[in-house]
Amino acid sequence: MAVGGAGSSRSVAPCCCCAVLLAAALLFSAPATTEAYDALDPNGNITIKWDVMSWTPDGYVAVVTMFNYQQFRHIQAPGWQLGWTWAKKEVIWSMVGAQTTEQGDCSKFKGGTPHCCKKDPTVVDLLPGTPYNMQIANCCKAGVINTFNQDPSNAASSFQISVGLAGTTNKTVKLPKNFTLKAPGPGYTCGRAMIVRPTKFFTGDGRRATQALMTWNVTCTYSQFLAQKTPSCCVSLSSFYNDTIVNCPTCSCGCQNNGTSPGSCVNENSPYLQSAIDGPGKWTGQPLVQCTSHMCPIRIHWHVKLNYKEYWRVKITITNFNYRMNYTQWNLVAQHPNFNNITQLFSFNYKPLTPYGSKINDTAMFWGVKFYNDLLMQAGPLGNAQSELLLRKDSKDFTFDKGWAFPHRVYFNGDNCVMPPPDAYPWLPNASPLTKQPLTLSVLVFSIVLATLLAYA
C-alpha cells in the first residue's frame, strides 16, 4: 500500500505542473485590459479627433473634438478630463475652449510664457458663460457630453490648442501617446493615436469643402469592471398577482451605519433636513441621500400592473433619493424578452437597442420627454418620473410564471443597477397540478367508498 501511495504521488506531480503551466499560459495570453467592453453597447466608444488646421513657426494649431458614440452613457458633471504624454518636448502655447489643470515648470522661457509646459498635461472643459473670445464651437459645457441617441446636438465637445516645440510638417509631427480619459471617474481605456484621412469641412451652402492638414484619432472604450464604481441605483419589483413587494436588496449602494461616510444620509421627516442639504457638502457635490435600507440615490420600481387577453401592462417609476442632485437628460436601459412587442408607451421616449444583432430585440432605452420629464428633480415630492408600457403577448414565450415578467437587467445613466435575487421575485400563487392532486384523489376515493356502501345498503 505504501509503494502504491508513493507511485500515485509521483504520477500526480507532473499533472499538477502541467495544470500550473496551463493556468499561467492562459493568464498571460488573456486579452489586455485595454480591450474594454460593455455587453449592452459593444460598439460604443468616445472618439477623440485631432485636426491640424495650420502650421506655426515652431509647431501647429489643432482643433480637438471628442465625439460620444456610446448608446446610453453620457459624460456627466463634473465632466471629462483628457490627458496624454507628449512624444518630445512639446509645450502648449495657448488654448481656446479648454484649459490645462496645471501650468507646470515654464522657467526656461524668457519671453512669452506658455499655457502649459508639463510633459503629461491634463485638459478640462471651460464652464458655461465663458467670454466669447475664449470660446470655440461645441466648447464650454463643463465637460458634459450627451449621447447621439438622446441628444445629438450636444454629443460632442471641442477645443483649440496651439502646440510649440513640435514638428511643422506631416512628416515631422510626433503623435502624443498614453492617452487617458476620465469621464468624470475611471473606466475608460484609450488606444494609440492613429493617423487617418484628413477631416473635410463643408461651407454652410455645401458648395465648397476644405480639409485639415493632418488628422489622427484616439478611441476610448468603457468597462464597468475597470470603473469599479459603487452601485448608484437599485431595482424593486411588484405585481398585481402577488401582494409581495420586493424591495431593493439591503445595502445595495451602502449601509446607514457606515462609519466611513458619516452624515451621508438624512431622514425624510427630519427637522434638520434643510440645514443638512445646505451643509458644507452642497458646494462640493457630495451626495446626500434619504436614509433607506438600500442607500441608493436612484431606485427603479417595476410593477406588473394589468393583464389583458392579448396584452399586458407594466408601470415603471424612477425615484431620486439624492437631495443634492437632479438628473438632466437621464436615461434608463432595461432587458426583457418581450420588448420586441412594445405596442404603446406613455410619457417616455423609447428606442430599441440591438447589441446582439437585429434578430434579437430584447433591450430598450427610455428617456424623458423634453420640457416635461427630461429633468429628474432632486429628492422630494417632484423627484420621480413614471411611465407605463403596453406590450403584446407572444403566445410562444409569454408567462407570468417564475418571474418572467420582470427585467433581466437595468441600467440608469449607464450604471448597472442592483437587482433583487431571482428567488425573491413575486411568483404566481401556487396552483400547480401537483398541489391539486391529493384533493382530487381524496374526492375520488370518497366517491368510490360511498358508492360501495350504497351498493350494499
Swiss-Prot record:
Domain of life: Eukaryota
GO CC annotations on file: plasma membrane; side of membrane
InterPro entries to which the protein is assigned, alphabetical: COB_C (IPR056900), COBRA_pln (IPR006918)
An example Gene Ontology biological process: plant-type cell wall cellulose biosynthetic process
Keyword Thylakoid part of the UniProt annotation: no
Signal peptide annotation: 1-35
Keywords assigned: Cell membrane, Glycoprotein, GPI-anchor, Lipoprotein, Membrane, Signal, Transmembrane, Transmembrane helix
Maturation propeptide residues: 431-457
Intracellular or extracellular location(s): Cell membrane
Keyword Glycoprotein: yes
Major location category of this protein: membrane
Lipid bilayer topology: Lipid-anchor; GPI-anchor
Segments traversing the membrane: 437-457
Residues listed as glycosylation sites in the UniProt record: N45, N170, N178, N217, N242, N258, N326, N341, N361
Residues with a covalently attached lipid (GPI-anchor amidated asparagine): N430
PANTHER family linked: COBRA-LIKE PROTEIN 4, PROTEIN COBRA
Main function: Involved in determining the orientation of cell expansion, probably by playing an important role in cellulose deposition. May act by recruiting cellulose synthesizing complexes to discrete positions on the cell surface.
Family indicated by similarity: Belongs to the COBRA family.
Protein name: COBRA-like protein 3
